[in-house]
Every structure is written in C-alpha cells, then in structure tokens.
A protein has these predicted regions:
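Metal-dependent nuclease catalytic cores that hydrolyze phosphodiester bonds in DNA/RNA
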Residues: 1-129
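Mg2+/Mn2+-dependent nuclease catalytic core
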Residues: 115-153
C-alpha cells in the first residue's frame, strides 16, 4: 500500500542565530539567554533517575538503548522536517522511525503551510531561548510544532 504524500506551501521567514558552548546559550537580538533545555536540566532530577536506570540495566545495555533511541529520534525529526519542506523521499524511510513517521503523518497532514523550520525563539522578559521544530499554519492559526518522543508513542 502506498502512502500519499501531501505538498505544503512554503513561506519564507527564518533568521540566523549563534549557539555557544554548554550549557547552550542562544545569542538573540535581545541578549544572550540559556536554552530551555539547559534550564530544565538544572531544575529536574533527571540525572539521578538516569543513573539509577543505568545501574539497574547495566552500562552496556543503557548505552545500546540510548544510542538506538537517539538514532530513531534523529531519523524521525529529519523525516518530519523534510516532509514539511516537501523534500522527503519515500526511499529514505526506514526502521522504527518509519513506523513512527507513519503514525505522526496524519497530524502533519493537518498543516496548511510551513512558515519555517528549526526556528530559534526567545523570551526577553523571562530570559530564556530555544529552538522549535517548525512554525506552521494549522486550522488557520500560527502553530508551533516541537517533537518530543517517548518510548510508548
């Protein structure tokens, strides 16, 4: 069975940015701000939970799972972005990321137009910044898309 691909209207509007070091700092027109991911890493106890999980499953298994999840997430991110930019070739789809893409495609098909992908955004008042996967028109509204993948998707 062949999956039908949609063609999206492209609207130009992206801008450049510079990222420095770790933790990630975005250089915005309003100043330098830490990334949202860096802020969340400081205020959550994620490292302790990951260390306990790593100890429970073993270092080798933890590395394997982490590497596979990272590769799958990167592939899916690439598929989603290319799809929104009308650049995805069916032959690129592979493995578990292909299955995930086929599950999220129905939501991407609700997009009316792609404004920009990989867009840096910031809040000068609260002094944080980040990058979203896409800004699109959806249901006649500007909408931010940002991929977050969980194992049970």
């Amino acid at each position: 069975m062949s999956i039908k691909f949609k063609t999206f209207t492209q609207i130009d509007g992206a801008f450049d940015e510079v990222i420095e070091g770790s933790p990630r700092i975005y250089c915005t027109p309003s100043g330098k701000f830490p990334s949202m991911t860096s802020i969340l890493a400081v205020i959550t106890d994620k490292e302790d939970g990951l260390a306990k999980w790593r100890e429970r499953v073993g270092a080798e298994e933890a590395d394997r799972i982490t590497n596979e999840a990272g590769a799958r997430g990167n592939d899916l991110h690439e598929y989603n972005e290319k799809y929104l930019l009308n650049q995805l070739d069916r032959s690129e789809l592979k493995g578990q990321a292909k299955l995930l893409f086929n599950r999220v495609k129905r939501y991407l098909d609700e997009v009316e137009a792609t404004i920009a992908t990989e867009v840096p955004l910031w809040n000068a008042d609260d002094q944080y910044a980040g990058r979203v996967d896409a800004i699109v028109m959806m249901n006649q509204h500007l909408t931010i898309l940002d991929q977050i993948i969980q194992e049970n998707l």
